[in-house]
Amino acid sequence: VPVIKFTDQKSFSQISTEAKELAKRAKDKKLQPAEMDGNTFTVSNLGMFGIESFTSIINMPASCILSVGAIKQVPVVKNGAVVPGNTMMLSLACDHRTVDGATGAAFLQTLKTFIENPVTMLV
């Protein structure tokens, strides 16, 4: 799995650009070993294959892995009316030697807020 290092010091744009470059090199089988070393958090997305929900296994040395499922349109209630809405299943597996379950839950709550209201990421 390609690793984007020092993401806390990069903008969303820089992370996006680097992710695209690493994905292209991975597809072309041109990744270097150093580009796959040192991960702490992994994102596994099977949603693009129509998989709605799954549980990933943490690859060491990562502390967590986030499983991202497909976006599915379902009826939701908004302002008292039933309307079409998009839902997506996320699952977070944490190594409890390094990440407490409550910390993982807080992360998922924050991520949910960001996904439902993307502008909050910029504030």
Place the predicted regions along the sequence by residue.
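C-terminal catalytic/motor cores of large multi-domain enzyme assemblies
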Residues: 1-123
